[in-house]
Amino acid sequence: MKSEFEASPVVDAAPWIDLRRYDQSWFERGKPGWFILWWWFVQAIAFPLSLHNSHGFRCWLLRLFGAKIGKGVMIRPTARFTYPWKIAIGDYSWIGDDAILYSLDRITIGSQCVISQKCYLCTGSHDFHDVAFNLIATPIVI
């Protein structure tokens, strides 16, 4: 008896997902491509090389790229932000080491919140009921 992994594929069956039909041309990143590349460059160099307690510097960089950052916010040097112009962080909140804010849509973090190390906030997913596996982006509010 063959296991399910040894069975021959059914080549005539319609695929559940057809990635040839995937299209995200409708998706709006919110800024032009050169601006996004500039942000990725700044984040890759300035964040990890900034001093341990340079929270103000990292907040300033995020604000420079459009994030709404409250007072007293602490952001660790290894935190990552996909599109800072889609992020708002309230007063006295902390973003821990290796936290990733994957902001295809808005991410709003209130005051006095902690997004701890290695947290992954993801506003994007895919519609696995759709044969084209289209992108879904939904805001996160904490």
Region spans (language model):
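Flexible, glycine/small-residue-enriched loop-and-beta-strand segment within the central core
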Residues: 49-60, 76-89, 94-142
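Terminal amphipathic alpha-helical/low-complexity segments used for targeting or macromolecular assembly
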Residues: 1-67
